[in-house]
Curated annotation (Swiss-Prot):
Keywords, in A-Z order: Plasmid
Gene name of the encoded protein: psiB
Name of protein: Protein PsiB
Function statement: Could be involved directly or indirectly in exopolysaccharide synthesis.
Taxonomy of the source species: Bacteria, Pseudomonadati, Pseudomonadota, Alphaproteobacteria, Hyphomicrobiales
Length: 134
């Protein structure tokens, strides 16, 4: 489950403060809209992940902590001027799931019988959900 919550930014003029908030020294800024910016950890996709986030209109999945701040960098960042509910509509939280595939009753292999119901393989699918607001 991926959750969204409000957080305080200790120093609105400091990139170090944003880095501390999302827990990454290497951060990327993504335009959310004309009045807001997203900040994400640049290296979060490099490590093995159990979940990721799709941001509407952005071509690459996002992983790790994400911060939404008001402003475009020309002035100190501030609290967003939209609600968390409005912002959450643009995100989809995803996680990979492994589904077991079992051998059917009548399956015969070229080297003999396969026991019906035996695990044959695993299939990967992506579970997609709306974020949970805290």
């Amino acid at each position: 489950m991926r959750s969204f919550r409000a957080a305080e930014l200790p120093d609105r003029n400091s990139i170090a403060s944003i880095s501390g908030l999302i827990g990454s020294d290497l951060i990327q800024m993504i335009r959310f809209d004309d009045m807001h910016s997203l900040f994400v950890g640049e290296e979060a996709l490099r490590v093995g992940l159990t979940a990721f986030t799709i941001f509407d209109g952005y071509p690459i999945p996002l992983a790790g902590q994400i911060a939404l701040l008001g402003g475009d960098g020309s002035k100190p960042y501030r609290s967003p001027s939209i609600t968390m509910t409005e912002a959450a509509r643009r995100f989809e939280c995803c996680r990979p799931v492994l589904d077991p595939v079992f051998a059917p009753m009548d399956r015969v292999a070229n080297k003999g019988l396969i026991v019906a119901g035996a695990l044959e393989s695993l299939q990967v699918r992506i579970d997609r959900r709306s974020p949970v607001l805290l």
